[in-house]
Structures are given as structure tokens and as C-alpha cells.
């Protein structure tokens, strides 16, 4: 799930690529999203007809995909704490905003909390008979979190649109009066970059939400087809990787 914290725009830095990569890989989300890319890229290959079913590599790809899926769950250990802290540090202007924050962070936090037990069932410590109902709770909590997350981000996008209109009006007035507006131009550029990241983040949540609905419906329906879900997962992973890369 995409984190609901505001997207930060940082100015490009002249950084050594390997140093930047080291910083990226030192983060939990950095490694997790690379695993997510490899998993869903593998699922796309398996869902397509690129490799005949009779080839010996198919069982190995299926084993790899399954192992990566279990490995990713280990990265969720304790991750629910970030949602608790995010909710504690949040600010709101109305009860409506507070409800959205509770839905978003509460849903995601419960999802990450339950995922720890799912990992323990996959690892064999907890009896596998508990796996199905734990996965249902996890999926519903995740879906609730996405509803709150998308709602908050749409609200933020509207605020950015209002801010963009205000800055555009200021620039127009400055130009008509023959005044310099370098500061406003830079501000407009920053707003547009924030809007781009916000839109990508919304699309990422929608893609992840589609996969969650497929889990709830046990893979039934046209939108739950393996190639559709795999493509949504890969898109989400690439967006997350991009956001994590530019933020570190």
C-alpha cells in the first residue's frame, strides 16, 4: 500500500549513482519494491504464452514467484507502527478529515498487523488452517485503507489545483504589469511536480486496490484475470520504486 504522507519534491542532487543506490537499498521499502517488481514481472511471464508450459523453467519461475511473495511479507514486520505514528502526527481541520485519516491509516495499519501472522503461517510457525481467514481480514483491511487513502489524495489534489490557479493568476497579473515573477514560476513548477506525483500515487492505490478486490473475490471476474492483476502489480511497484528513489 502506498503511504499517505504528502509527496515531497526534492531538487536534483549531484550524487554518485552507487551511493544513491546504497541509500535506496538500505530502506525497507526500497528492497520490498524491487522484490515486488521481480515478482509481478515473473507473474506476467507466467500468465502470458511467452514460454511453453512444457519448458522446465516454468516450475522454477512459479517457485521463485511464490518465494518472493513470502519474502515480501517479512518486510511488513512492525510496519503497522508507522501508521500509528502517522495518525498521531496528523492534523485535520474537520471531523470529516479525521474520519478519512482513521480509515486510511487504520485500514493500512490493521493490514500490516495481520500480514505478520500470515507470514508466520506461510513460514510454518502457525497452523496453515488459519491462513484463509487471516488473508480475508488482511484483504478487507487493505481495501478500507485504500478507500481512505484515495479520498485523502483526491482532496489534496483539489487543494493543489486551487493553489495552482492562485499562482497562475498572480503570474498573469505580474506579466500584465511588466513585473518579474521568477519566484512564482518556480512555485508553479513545484506545484505541477507535486500534482504529477499525487496523480501517480492515486493510480498506484487504484492498481493495488484492484489486486485487493481480486483477493477478496478469490480471483473471480474479468478484472481478476492473471495478466490484468500482474500488470497492475508491476505498475504499482514501478511507481513506488520511482517515488522511493527520488525521495532518498
From Swiss-Prot:
The lineage's top-level taxon is Eukaryota
Pull the Cytoplasmic topological domain ranges from the record.
1-97, 242-248
Membrane-crossing ranges are 98-118, 221-241
What gene makes this protein? PEX11A
Which stretches face the Lumenal side?
119-220
Family indicated by similarity: Belongs to the peroxin-11 family.
Q: What is this protein called?
A: Peroxisomal membrane protein 11A
UniProt keyword Transmembrane present: yes
Q: What function is annotated for this protein?
A: Involved in peroxisomal proliferation. Promotes peroxisomal duplication, aggregation or elongation without fission.
